[in-house]
Amino acid sequence: MINIKIPKNKNDKFIEKFFIQKNLKIIVDLSKKNKPSVNEMVLSEAYMPDLKDLYRLYQYVLLNKRTTIFEFGSGWSTLIFNLALSELKVKFSKKINNLRRNNPFEIFVLETSKKFMKISKNRVNHFNKLLEIKNPAKIHYTQSDVEMTLLNQNICTQYKKIPLCNPDFIYLDGPDQFDVKNDIKGISTRHKDMMPMVSDILKLEYFYTPGTIIICDGRGANARFLKDNFKRKWEYICDNKNDQHIFWLNDPILGKHNKAQLEFYDK
């Protein structure tokens, strides 16, 4: 049985203190600005940071000693993944050499918007300098259009281009449902009553190694679509309190390299 570590719920005061101790008070201050309303779905500016979400993402990566992150979308989460992987890199860069991980302490960001990708990239570079991170995680940025498609006769979306990697942590927070090209029989996600429906994870499922974690930020309909169409054995938690859907691959170990990888996570 493959298990993962779930971060404990913390109150707002604890989380604010956590970020302040990381010299990230600016994120705490920005998080208190106004957030968009439920029907304000097409935004011209980047979202303000959500402290609770960011704290939990940081802890998921740290507690489970992730090595390679694939992020659908970009934003403040990209910065947090960078900080978490950079911390793990300092602690485990030598030990990782014994594993079959060819992109250790690297992040692959897949974004539809050149504008928001540039914002995320500049933000990460700014904080790397501000926090004097000498050897940060390596980040690969890929811009790709998204189109409507069919998977098992279900209408959904797919990216036209995906970066080559095999992550052990996948964060699903993109694309924006309005950044999708064409339609299928007149249907697309470009309507406020529709919802995101990414299919790319399903197409890559058989490449993932046991122990791989997927976190969906909200996107409950997309999480259900994944759950109903996965072929391998995935454990699933619907975390309503934090509006997250967590999957991890609890499949039979593939061989000695996968076994060593799982042992690294648990030590």
What positions do the PLM features span?
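A short helix->loop->beta-strand "cap" motif at the edges of active sites that frequently abuts
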Residues: 89, 103-105, 209-212
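S-adenosyl-L-methionine
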Residues: 117-166
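Class I SAM-dependent methyltransferase Rossmann-like catalytic core
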Residues: 18-65, 79
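Conserved SAM-binding motif I beta-strand of class I
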Residues: 92-99, 104-111
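C-terminal substrate-binding/active-site "lid" region of AdoMet-derived donor-dependent transferases
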Residues: 142, 153, 175-267
